[in-house]
UniProtKB/Swiss-Prot annotation:
Residues 40-60 are annotated as: Disordered. GO terms for biological process: apoptotic process. Belongs to the TCTP family. The keyword Ribosomal protein does not apply. GO terms for molecular function: calcium ion binding. PROSITE patterns: TCTP_3. Gene3D superfamilies: Metal Binding Protein, Guanine Nucleotide Exchange Factor, Chain A (2.170.150.10). Residues 1-139 form the TCTP domain. GO terms for cellular component: cytoplasm. This is Putative translationally-controlled tumor protein-like protein TPT1P8. Keywords: Apoptosis. Residues 40-51 have a biased composition (Polar residues). InterPro entries: Mss4-like_sf (IPR011057), Mss4/transl-control_tumour (IPR011323), TCTP (IPR034737), Translational_control_tumour_p (IPR018105).
Length: 139
């Protein structure tokens, strides 16, 4: 299994168990996600070896809770971030600057492609800012 890490923080982001597409000429990765529902608190009597007919005749009420989340968030301990539009712009600008510096050190031939590709990508991400949530790795 391949674990993808953030270039700057080196924190785990996702693994290759998900469908992954390269977008923006290979500058970004898009990862497929699915919604999961998990029920907690309701245990089936057969799983614990309890014979309900020989025990109490009273009906016992057990509470159960259904938790719905995105699989990649749950499996890789990501946290939803809450940004204002201005804070998001600043965060993206600082993050892109950090990536640019890393590219200059490690792969200088990709710097120009990165700068032009990210100008287009960051303006697109600002357009869809209101309809999506941003996820950050848990540190």
């Amino acid at each position: 299994m391949i674990i993808f890490q953030d270039l700057i923080s080196h924190n785990e982001m996702f693994s290759d168990i998900y469908k992954i597409w390269e977008i923006t000429n290979g500058l970004c990765l898009e990862v497929e996600q699915k919604m999961l529902s998990k029920t907690t608190g309701n245990t089936d009597d057969s799983l614990i070896g309890r014979n309900s007919s020989s025990e109490s005749t009273e009906d016992e009420v057990t509470e159960s809770t259904i938790i719905t989340s995105v699989d990649i968030v749950t499996n890789h301990h990501l946290q939803e971030s809450i940004f204002t539009k201005e804070a998001y712009k600043k965060y993206i600008k600082d993050y892109m600057k950090s990536i640019n510096e890393k590219l200059e050190e490690q792969r200088p031939e990709r710097v120009k492609l990165f700068i032009t590709g990210m100008k287009n990508k960051s303006s697109t991400s600002l357009l869809i800012f209101k309809t999506t949530s941003s996820l950050l790795v848990k540190t």
